[in-house]
Amino acid sequence: MKVRVRLAPSPTGTLHLGTARTALFNWLFAKKEGGTFLLRIEDTDIERSREEYINDIYDGLKWLGINWDESPTIQSERVNEHKQIIKTLVDKGFAYKCYASEAELDEMRETQKRNGLAPKYDNRHRNLTPEQESEFIKLGRDPVIRFKISDEKLISWNDLIRGKMTWSGKDLGGDMVIARRAPGNSIGDPLYNLVVVADDSAMKISHVIRGEDHLANTAKQILLYEALDLNIPVFAHTPLILNSEGKKLSKRDGVTSISEFKKMGYTSEAMANYMTLLGWSVPEGINERFNISEVSEIFSFKKVNKASAKFDWDKLNWLNSQVIHEMSAETLLENLEPLFKENGWHLPSHEWGINLVGLIGPSMVLINDGVDQAKPFFEEQELSDDGKKQLEIKEAAVILKFILEKLADSDAASFSKEKALDLIDQATKSCKVKKGVVMKSLRAALFGTLNGPDLIQSWVLLSRFSKDRARISRLI
């Protein structure tokens, strides 16, 4: 069987973490099997679909390294084909017009609720006579079109993740609506389950890989495949992604879209790595820190868990820090320089920038951390409480005055690590203090705090701007 899989997002919002994980599993499976990964934009919700969301989906997938193999299919462009299929189902007796009003349906559901029953359409208009239909038309009622689902029908399939699955027709909510209300003999807007079957068949999809929240839809869609005498694809239902409280991850949990993760400073490699781990167990001997192109060679649904996956911020942060620490200084600078420019910061030289990221990179978890850590090199910082306390000791002023006088006799462009160390030794001897006192006082004067990356390297970088002289002189 030629493997053809698809991602079918609805452009009613930005690319969600769960949708991106589904895309990743589809892509990995296609790569493993030498198949084709396709993209279909399900934009039939005209009121909520937006062009900006379509672009966000495209951009998010590309950023993650998930590229599709053929031009995207736009679902709304196939609406005439969808309506023709609905007409065929009606003509063959698999579907019918239902004239029940919304008020009648609400009353039906309320009655069922009072009797302790689950809401379910009671199929009241399944067998209307022509005379009954005429009466409803005279009343001005516009019908929906429903597909017949027998309560006695058992629907089974072999799920690649969950094994043998069986649903009973009586648990599917009664005859399902496949087209919205429309006047006369016209067919209303086709609905989800119908158009998915129509498009998956037209695209020759061999495997449908999606979240477990689609299990009931799969049962309904299999009935449509059978009625239309179409080949039924193989199904795989991935586990849900839960928040820390064990509830389905939603917008209420804060960041859920790929574009938001990107803005926060997460790397595409770490995101793809982490999303693969959300539901997939790493085979023995494989490190959890990997590249998705490597995983595509070993990916298997046998290692995808049935149980839901909990989102773990600590794990994602660890992976992101690993990716950053593995970056070359050139790559890290490429990521950071646009952020520096946004803040109005300009590098005195490329070499200076390379040295800066080499200094701050090891302590970064997010790309955006580089902005905070680089800020003291571009902008003078307010004194922290511990910095103020250090500069209030009587020796501090003497130390800083000595260092400033020595700096005045040196060339900023040639200031080096060796010269910095020598100057600290001179200050220690001349001021008759411990080296630690000199270094703490100097750090507080230069950076406003007693904490930070290596002081000597930091000082050498700052000296390229001659900012060390300016900052010390303001404190004396």
From Swiss-Prot:
Residues annotated to bind ATP: 251
Motif 'KMSKS' region in this chain: 248-252
Location in the cell: Cytoplasm
Enzyme Commission identifier(s): 6.1.1.17
UniProtKB keywords: Aminoacyl-tRNA synthetase, ATP-binding, Cytoplasm, Ligase, Nucleotide-binding, Protein biosynthesis
Enzyme class: ligase
Extent of motif 'HIGH' region: 9-19
Example GO molecular function: ATP binding
Pfam family, one: Anticodon_2
GO cellular component: cytosol
Gene3D superfamilies, A to Z: 1.10.10.350, Glutamate-tRNA synthetase, class I, anticodon-binding domain 1, Glutamyl-trna Synthetase, Domain 2, Glutamyl-tRNA Synthetase, Domain 3, HUPs
UniProt catalytic activity: tRNA(Glu) + L-glutamate + ATP = L-glutamyl-tRNA(Glu) + AMP + diphosphate
An annotated GO BP: glutamyl-tRNA aminoacylation
InterPro entries membership: aa-tRNA-synth_I_cd-bd (IPR045462), aa-tRNA-synth_I_codon-bd_sub2 (IPR020751), aa-tRNA-synth_I_CS (IPR001412), aa_tRNA-synth_I_cd-bd_sf (IPR008925), Glu-tRNA-ligase_bac/mito (IPR004527), Glu-tRNA-synth_I_codon-bd_sub1 (IPR020752), Glu/Gln-tRNA-synth (IPR000924), Glu/Gln-tRNA-synth_Ib_cat-dom (IPR020058)
Highest taxon above the source species: Bacteria
Function comment: Catalyzes the attachment of glutamate to tRNA(Glu) in a two-step reaction: glutamate is first activated by ATP to form Glu-AMP and then transferred to the acceptor end of tRNA(Glu).
The protein's assembly and partners: Monomer.
NCBIfam families named in the record: gltX_bact
Sequence similarity: Belongs to the class-I aminoacyl-tRNA synthetase family. Glutamate--tRNA ligase type 1 subfamily.
Name recorded for this polypeptide: Glutamate--tRNA ligase
Phylogenetic lineage: Bacteria, Bacillati, Cyanobacteriota, Cyanophyceae, Synechococcales
